[in-house]
UniProtKB/Swiss-Prot annotation:
It holds the Pfam family Ribosomal_S7. GO terms for cellular component: small ribosomal subunit. PROSITE patterns: RIBOSOMAL_S7 (PS00052). Belongs to the universal ribosomal protein uS7 family. GO terms for biological process: translation. InterPro entries: Ribosomal_uS7 (IPR000235), Ribosomal_uS7_bac/org-type (IPR005717), Ribosomal_uS7_CS (IPR020606), Ribosomal_uS7_dom (IPR023798), Ribosomal_uS7_dom_sf (IPR036823). Part of the 30S ribosomal subunit. Contacts proteins S9 and S11. One of its GO terms (molecular function) is rRNA binding. It comes from Desulfotalea psychrophila (strain LSv54 / DSM 12343). One of the primary rRNA binding proteins, it binds directly to 16S rRNA where it nucleates assembly of the head domain of the 30S subunit. Is located at the subunit interface close to the decoding center, probably blocks exit of the E-site tRNA. This is Small ribosomal subunit protein uS7.
Amino acid sequence: MSRRKTIEKRPVTPDPRFNSVLVAKFTNGLMERGKKSLAQRIFYDAMDLVADRMKDEEPLTVFEEAMEKVRPRVEVKSRRVGGATYQVPMEIRQARRNALAIRWIISYAKSRSGKCMSEKLASEVMDAFNNRGAAVKKRDDTHRMAEANKAFAHYRW
C-alpha cells in the first residue's frame, strides 16, 4: 500500500459573469502565460457573438450543449500483451471528458482561419452546438476507434 496521502482537489471558483465552474475551467484552458483577464475577455466576447448570431438561444446553454456534444465517452489506450500492442477501448471519467472537450474546442478554434480568437471560438462553439466542426469530428473519430477495437475490450485493466 502506498503511504502517500491523497491530494485534495482545489475547488475551482466559478466565473464572475455566468457563475459557472465549467466556464471558469474553460477560461483557464484558454489562458496563456497567466493572462486570465485576457482569456476571460476572449471568452465573453465569443459568448456575446454567439448571443448576437443565435438570438433565440441563451449563450451559456449553447456553450454547455456544445461541450456536451464534444465530450467523448470512450477512448483507446495502448496495452502490451505478449509482445503485441493492442488499442484497448476504455470508458473515460467525467473530469477527463471535460478536459478533452475543452482542449479540443480550444485547439480547433485556434487552427481556424479568422480575424480574432473570440470570433474563431464563437464559430467553433456554434458549429459544435449544431453537431458540426472539427471538435465534433475528433469526438466521432475517437468513438470510431473505440468501436473498431471493441474486440480487445477484455484486455481492460
